[in-house]
Amino acid sequence: LGAKAEVDLRGMTTDEAELTLAQFLDRAMVSNLTQVTVIHGKGTGAVRKAVHAYLKRCKGVASFRLGRYGEGEDGVTIVELS
């Protein structure tokens, strides 16, 4: 029963999303997950921008990219953990 490999931030404010993302990434790293999916939705893009800004300064993140076809496209971000 480790951490889930995805988190859904849709409908949250950018502050709520950042806090939830921080807690999720902490659990993912402790559980030694190597890849996780962050669902932020398409909407206005505010949550996506906040997620990407947070990921850029998060030490445990090796890389991240928007989802591809079949992964959720630009409504999700795929994160590789180091």
What are these regions (language model features)?
Residues 1-82:
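Long, charged, low-complexity intrinsically disordered regions
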